[in-house]
């Protein structure tokens, strides 16, 4: 159980509660979760964040009406800066997007500007929004994380409770730069405890991290209850704390739920994330 699971900000969320679906635009449906909620227990504060990054959302179920009442569809990509005050709760995001369904907008740019304005106001931070017609993205290849996959190791695991101590002593003497990938990341929603499935790429330069220890650590998230963004920041923080790499990037891409996927990344070096969807997305 996360130390902040009873935080008052969580009690106000619609997540985990019966809700009505609204067909007409309503920005008040968006709900924020303070990033400080999970950062402060990790010793992370706005004036000394050890990383930069973003939460990249893909919107697969976005529709509105044009001026003639004809439904329009697009795929959206949102990038929310990690230094925003709040993250955006995903169920509220879904409800907000549903409120576009029967709302007339003059054109696609009006939809984009509305999304950017509302999301920035909710997150209290910088947001970029891109909307794509379907013919712009049809036929795009499935992407893959570059790096050595950790998942084929012949090891026995019998504990699935989160334990950062797997990384204790995991940093070796050899100095390397490598990318490591696992598709076994699984955590659970902080509120509903529904499973969240993801793939994670860890790129670092520094003392070589023991691959078995790192895989055991990642598998230990299996019963852990935390939002996607919080899990990625926890992974970044734990690797920095125990292994002390010179540079580190953690990038996770989660499978979609409710027409949305969330893909957070955190880094202390130059990094440009590839945003193509993975096989399970």
UniProtKB/Swiss-Prot annotation:
One of its GO terms (cellular component) is cytosol. Substrate binds at residues 88-90, 228-229. Keywords: Cytoplasm, NADP, Oxidoreductase, Queuosine biosynthesis. Pathway: tRNA modification; tRNA-queuosine biosynthesis. InterPro entries: GTP-CH-I_C/QueF (IPR043133), NADPH_dep_7-cyano-7-deazaG_red (IPR050084), QueF (IPR029500), QueF_N (IPR029139), QueF_type2 (IPR016428). One of its GO terms (molecular function) is preQ1 synthase activity. HAMAP family: QueF_type2. One of its GO terms (biological process) is tRNA modification. It comes from Yersinia pestis. The active site is at 189 (thioimide intermediate), 196 (proton donor). Homodimer. It is an enzyme of class 1 (oxidoreductase). This is NADPH-dependent 7-cyano-7-deazaguanine reductase. NCBIfam families: QueF (TIGR03138). NADPH binds at residues 90-91, 257-258. It comes from the Bacteria. Catalyzes the NADPH-dependent reduction of 7-cyano-7-deazaguanine (preQ0) to 7-aminomethyl-7-deazaguanine (preQ1). It catalyses: 7-aminomethyl-7-carbaguanine + 2 NADP(+) = 7-cyano-7-deazaguanine + 2 NADPH + 3 H(+). It is found in: Cytoplasm. The lineage of its organism: Bacteria, Pseudomonadati, Pseudomonadota, Gammaproteobacteria, Enterobacterales. Belongs to the GTP cyclohydrolase I family. QueF type 2 subfamily.
């Amino acid at each position: 159980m996360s130390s902040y699971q009873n935080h008052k900000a969580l009690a106000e969320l619609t997540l985990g509660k019966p809700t009505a679906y609204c067909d007409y635009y309503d920005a008040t449906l968006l709900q924020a979760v303070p990033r400080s909620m999970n950062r402060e227990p990790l010793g992370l504060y706005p004036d000394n964040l050890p990383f930069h990054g973003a939460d990249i959302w893909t919107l697969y179920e976005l529709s509105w009406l044009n001026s003639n009442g004809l439904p329009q569809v697009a795929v959206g990509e949102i990038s929310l800066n990690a230094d925003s005050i709040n993250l955006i709760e995903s169920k509220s995001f879904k409800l907000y997007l549903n409120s576009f369904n029967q709302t007339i907008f003059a054109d696609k740019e009006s939809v984009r500007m509305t999304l950017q304005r509302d999301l920035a106001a909710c997150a209290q931070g910088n947001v970029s929004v891109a909307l794509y017609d379907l013919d712009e993205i049809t036929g795009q290849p499935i992407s893959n994380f570059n790096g050595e996959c950790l998942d084929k190791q012949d090891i026995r695991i019998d504990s699935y409770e989160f334990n950062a101590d797997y990384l204790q002593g995991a940093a070796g003497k050899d100095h390397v730069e490598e990318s490591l990938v696992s598709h076994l990341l699984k955590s659970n929603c902080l509120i509903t405890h529904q499973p969240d499935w993801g793939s994670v790429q860890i790129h670092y330069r520094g003392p070589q991290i023991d691959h078995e220890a790192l895989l055991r650590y990642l598998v230990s998230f299996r019963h852990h209850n935390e939002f996607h963004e919080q899990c990625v920041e926890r992974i970044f923080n734990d690797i920095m704390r125990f292994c002390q790499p010179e540079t580190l990037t953690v990038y996770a891409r989660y499978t979609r739920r409710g027409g949305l996927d969330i893909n957070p990344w955190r880094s202390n070096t130059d990094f440009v994330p590839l945003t193509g969807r993975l096989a399970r997305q």
